[in-house]
Swiss-Prot record:
Keywords: 4Fe-4S, Cytoplasm, Iron, Iron-sulfur, Metal-binding, S-adenosyl-L-methionine, Transferase, tRNA processing. GO terms for molecular function: 4 iron, 4 sulfur cluster binding; metal ion binding; N6-isopentenyladenosine methylthiotransferase activity. [4Fe-4S] cluster 1 binds at residues 27, 63, 97. Its EC number is 2.8.4.3. Residues 157-385 form the Radical SAM core domain. Its cofactor is [4Fe-4S] cluster. It is an enzyme of class 2 (transferase). This is tRNA-2-methylthio-N(6)-dimethylallyladenosine synthase.
Amino acid sequence: MNPTLTESQTLTPTIQLGKVYVETYGCQMNEYDSGIVKELFRKEHYETTNVVEESDIIFLNTCAVRENAHAKIYGRLQSLGYLKKKNPNLVIGVLGCMAQNLGEDLFHQELPLDLIVGPDNYRTLPELIQNIRNGEKDVQLTRLSRSETYDELEPKVVNGIQAFVTIMRGCNNFCTFCVVPYTRGRERSREPKSIIHEIKQLQEMGVKQVTLLGQNVNSYSYESYDFCALVESILKETTIERVRFTSPHPKDFPDHLISLMAKEDRFSSQIHMPLQAGSSKVLRDMKRSYTKEEYLDLVKKIQSVIPDIGITSDIIVGFPGETEEEFLETLEVVKKVKFDMSYMFKYSEREGTIAKRKFIDDVPEEVKSRRLIELVELQTKISLEKNTSKIGKIFSILIENTSKKSKQELCGRSHCGRMVVFPIPEGMSQDLSDWIGKTVNVLIEQATSATLKGKLIV
């Protein structure tokens, strides 16, 4: 006798339409977008895979911020040619900012490529794949949207106890060096209730810390909600242990955001605050909307309210027209602020940007390289000094994983974003699951420019 089928059961098994492989380049937003793509295909009965050789569809989710990002993708596409020869039905697509930036020009590069889709068009991907399987060639869709936020998809981009949650997309600032407004469109924000629902689901999966993402995260605006109101709602309506955010713009940093960071223990006291340059003239040419003095005043205000704040930054050297004196101004700002860490780059001209149209890339490459070396050396020295000053102090650490160098060492971050490594004490559990996600106190005993090392306080 056959058992009775319930309403949720079906006589026909789900047919898998193929295996999808997604490779991600660039920022945390791209990591989140790759999660959106996987979720879209899962809903359409595709399987996702981490093995490129067994895939039926390969997507490269790309970045367009720097020139070497393009070179990486060209090289990667060429390396995938052998799979296309083995399986002519394999579909290879380029997604993301490079797809949006270069569009159909990618089809003229003699690459094994079937599909080009920009960040605002991912909902169409399953349909576009079907069109390709029906014989359509060189499929491209790169329309920008003023409304798409993928609100209901909630891809759950989880790394252990941490997760990213995109709260807004796009950028309205049009910094002259930046391609993002042209590849991701204008700013639009997700509904607060959708964001909070996603965080609650992440909590149920064991996530302890979420990082709120946006190209200009603190310019979040949805009806009556600004960024502070959103964070307050998250802290009130969830029990998530830590809330971080990246990347803010200095022009959108009101006093009540600083007060909220000082007041709320669960709101991480760490800020990634892009400087980009230390000269007001260069900042004006970059269209950054603040002067050197305004940036320094903001940092001084933040540090006065939150003395142990962790501040990191982005800095570009060799922007068109940057003189030696203007570069020295950048070094002076770095010395005054004493960033915990910085991402430092040589200026590279990007197709489609205002700087490409308006300025001549006139700083010689050897000068850019020398300035970058000087800046990196200064930042490394400051990072070491700051970390060395923490020796003898005790920090509350949220354990994330084992350290890269040893399975007998655990690592995690302090409330201010500092990476701390410490050994598992003898006689205590060596089972990683007993440690991950726990908050412990660690006494700092050693320091490098990147890491604090210590021992567990039992």
